[in-house]
């Protein structure tokens, strides 16, 4: 622990030694779970920075510590920067939120079913345009935005929320077209300089690499991450796109959090009108009933508190920005690893700073009827047992007891080297008897008959396998068959996807990803040789068979 800057009082209250110890304990627990090599956090109120803490290492090999000057990539928190710049142009009368994007980018084109209204700036800001998330298949924005013309849409603009990085890339091109300068210059002039964020860099380039903490990823990119997984330096890349290409420090980011706490007012006057900030923080309901997405801001209700902010992820970095307007407190967490949850940690620090005593981590409850013994129905594996324990659910296999981490409802990670290529997915049969899937292998409850599975067609058997690309954002995925139902499985799901999703055939030979008929993400396969597809196109970007 390196404590570089500390002020013990704020707003008439005191962060005592117990409060600081609680914050350090919360960080230590988060780092033990996710194992980022280094982390920094900042706490602020509307008037100034209250606390900066740094932990761990900016670079493991040399054991270089994180300092208050260390830069971290903040990922999609950059979307909040982009939204502020767009709304400034709205305040200036230079952008109409409800005008079609083509009004500002004449070459912008997205196939729309007949009768659908055009996509507007507001749709892009709120992730309701109905377009794909984007696979980041190129290092720049223009070609990815251009390529939207080759991808179908299945829902009308404004109809549903679907997170889209490429939508914010398009907003960056709109900013450049209207403001007449590169994105980095727009952000520096409109946000960084007025907020006195002089250490922040609005583009990730080789020129700043020496100031950046080294990003770390898991050594095995085709396995689910867990606390014992080895780390390796993440792929380095340059980027300057409006969905996330900013590097900053905890001190500088506290200045940006204050902009949120002050409703759009900076240290020397308003950056956003009250009306613009109200629009920014008025959310569109998303996939989580306790959360809503505004214009570059996520509003989330957690345990009786209303938080606003955004998370961010880059190749080798994670970030979390949370503000509690009612408590007049905000926190930024930056880390150079992709484990743990910086958004959750930021909320915990706010609670501690506001006088709450941190509670114990909730123990994942296992639904009663999921516990029991299971046998593989393909005669290719050993039986296993799922059981509840005081520390949460466990898997017992081959004389070992393995802790299960909940990824989603009825979806668990077994943190060892035997089961970490796929999650454990509990599914229910028609008579409500659970069965357990691990990739394409089914485990049946002991004493229960194995239900017959439909035989997959030759066409489906051809697509099953492991696919890769050299794209550092989404390096690989697998297709497995569960009877005649194909499933798409990621070790680390990209934006717009889940860890596991079923695939549904479409009339044109492609597959829709997931059960939502309005989901724009599609997958299709070609180049079948010796009964194996050699190439898969994931929402427009190629991946190649690797098994």
Give residue spans per PLM region:
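A generic structural motif
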Residues: 56-58, 337, 493, 540
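Short, well-ordered beta-strand elements
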Residues: 309, 320-337, 434-438, 534-538
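Active-site SXXK
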Residues: 24-27, 41, 47, 70-98, ...
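Short, conserved catalytic-motif segment at the N-terminal edge
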Residues: 14-74, 94-96, 103, 109-111, ...
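Peripheral terminal and inter-domain segments
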Residues: 2, 343-547
């Amino acid at each position: 622990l390196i404590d570089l800057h500390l002020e013990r009082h704020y707003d008439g209250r005191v962060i005592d030694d117990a409060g600081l110890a609680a914050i350090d304990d919360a960080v230590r627990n988060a780092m033990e779970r996710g194992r980022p090599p280094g982390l920094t956090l900042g706490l602020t109120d509307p008037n100034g920075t209250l606390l900066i803490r740094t932990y761990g290492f900016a670079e493991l090999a040399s054991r270089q510590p994180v300092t208050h000057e260390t830069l971290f990539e903040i990922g999609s928190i950059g979307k909040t920067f982009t939204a502020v710049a767009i709304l400034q142009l709205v305040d200036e009368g230079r952008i109409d939120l409800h005008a079609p994007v083509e009004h500002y980018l004449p070459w912008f084109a997205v196939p729309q079913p007949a009768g659908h209204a055009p996509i507007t700036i507001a749709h892009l800001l709120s992730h309701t345009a109905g377009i794909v998330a984007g696979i980041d298949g190129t290092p720049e924005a223009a070609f990815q935005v251009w390529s939207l013309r080759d991808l179908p849409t299945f829902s009308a603009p404004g109809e549903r929320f679907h997170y889209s990085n490429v939508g914010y890339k398009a907003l960056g091109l709109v900013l450049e077209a209207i403001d007449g300068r590169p994105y980095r210059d727009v952000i520096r002039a409109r946000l960084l300089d007025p907020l006195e964020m002089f250490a922040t860099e609005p583009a990730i380039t080789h020129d700043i690499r020496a100031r950046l903490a080294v990003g770390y990823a898991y050594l095995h990119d085709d396995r689910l991450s867990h606390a014992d997984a080895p780390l390796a330096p993440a792929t380095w890349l340059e980027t300057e796109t409006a969905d996330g290409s900013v590097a900053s420090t905890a001190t500088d980011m506290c200045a940006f959090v204050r902009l949120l706490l002050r409703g759009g007012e900076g240290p020397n006057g308003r950056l956003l009108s009250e009306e613009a900030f109200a629009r920014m923080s008025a959310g569109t309901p998303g996939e989580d009933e306790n959360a809503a997405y505004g214009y570059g801001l996520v509003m989330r209700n957690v345990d009786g508190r209303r938080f606003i902010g955004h998370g961010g992820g880059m190749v080798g970095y994670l970030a979390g920005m949370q503000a509690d307007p009612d408590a007049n407190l905000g926190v930024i967490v930056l880390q150079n690893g992709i484990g743990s949850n910086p958004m959750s940690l930021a909320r915990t620090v706010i609670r501690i700073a506001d006088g709450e005593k941190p509670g114990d981590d909730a123990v994942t409850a296992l639904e009663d009827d999921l516990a029991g013994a299971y046998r593989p129905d393909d005669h290719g594996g050993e039986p296993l047992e799922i059981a509840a324990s005081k520390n949460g659910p466990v898997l017992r296999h081959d004389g070992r007891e393995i802790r299960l981490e909940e990824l989603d409802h009825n979806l668990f990670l077994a943190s060892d080297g035997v089961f970490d290529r796929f999650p454990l997915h509990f599914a229910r049969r028609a008579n409500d008897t659970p069965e357990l899937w691990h990739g394409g292998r089914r485990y049946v409850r002991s004493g229960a008959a194995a239900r017959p599975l439909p035989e997959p067609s030759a066409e489906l058997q051809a697509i099953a396998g492991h696919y890769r690309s050299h794209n550092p954002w989404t390096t690989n995925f697998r297709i497995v068959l569960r009877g005649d139902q194909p499933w798409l499985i990621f070790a680390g799901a990209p934006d717009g996807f889940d860890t596991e999703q079923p695939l549904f055939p479409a009339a044109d030979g492609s597959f829709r990803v997931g059960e939502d008929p309005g989901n724009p993400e599609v997958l299709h396969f070609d180049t079948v040789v010796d009964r194996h597809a050699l190439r898969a196109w994931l929402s427009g970007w190629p991946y190649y068979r690797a098994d």
